[in-house]
Amino acid sequence: MGMSDLNERLNQLEQGALNFLFPRRCPFCNQHIGSKELICAGCEKKLPYTGDRAVRQTSWGRVAAPLYYEDAVRRAILDFKFKGRMGGLPCFGSLTARCAAEEFGGEFDAITWVPVSRKRLRKRGFDQARYLAGSLCVEWHVEPQETLRKILDNPPQSGLEDADARRANVLGAYEAVHPERIAGKRFLLVDDI
């Protein structure tokens, strides 16, 4: 048995022990699922997939989402975002990667995320959009690129009534990190909601 075989076997044993101690759960209904599954069969059938309505054109580009933000999807995303429940990340990343591949194909040069402010990062302990971008990147074996920095701690978007108020709320809230590295490139910009 070579060193790489031994490492592979140790990784399998470690993963098996983790699955035994912390069984994987469906992020949408909390039901136990197999160690290689990302979602339970029931949720896979009944989730509110966006299907052929995944993409919407905006004044600054196209946006896409694999699922409608309602019921179990909303709960799972909020549990991830505000309670730090990371178990759903592989599922969220897989669904988002599949949606992005179908809707945007190779129309981007790199993947980035919408960062949180330093204040929210300290309070929450993690940047949920960065984690989501990272889980999507795992599917494609690439690394997300940091392109933006949030420079204003503006009010949360969730408390705003309409698209105009949300647009005004983020105006001037971000700056480019190393603008010379991103000039002329197209990015898949990942956010949680």
Residue ranges and their predicted role:
Residues 1-193:
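Glycine-rich phosphate/pyrophosphate-handling loop used in enzymes and phosphotransfer proteins
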